[in-house]
């Protein structure tokens, strides 16, 4: 992310294609292999910015948090709703306005977190979790992160090797935390 950031529809689409759809399609492509393993793991990279508490719409929060009724189809409809709202200039009106900058990045991580929970429910024999590894020194953060890439890799690697049986969880580095 750069210091000056203006979201265009093309950039919004690109962000969602990379952060949400890319993760989703890769996971779905690998599921047959993961299911045939006795130790299948999926570790999705998220962000503290993707927590539900940043949504100012109680209805959207409730829908995204209702893991018993949220489906992949409903989640994809929510992603489409976000895109449509952006295109129509109606993010705030439709409850998608997120505080601060980088709204689509935040929304994409909210969608990643929801997908993680749905997939964990659908595939109980796999360990599917998401992690926010912390603010990292990358081009995306203009190298302002507080940790190196090597340091940030510790938490995803920990989850990839974890045998605890825990699934569908959100980790803040190495600690389980709430999706809020």
Locations of the language-model features?
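A short, exposed helix-loop element centered on a Lys and neighboring polar residues
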Residues: 27-28, 117
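Catalytic cores of secreted/periplasmic or lumenal enzymes
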Residues: 125
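Flexible domain-boundary/linker segments
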Residues: 32, 47, 59-62, 129, ...
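C-terminal helical subdomain
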Residues: 25, 110, 130-138, 142-180
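Catalytic loop of short-chain dehydrogenase/reductase
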Residues: 2-16, 35-121, 132, 143
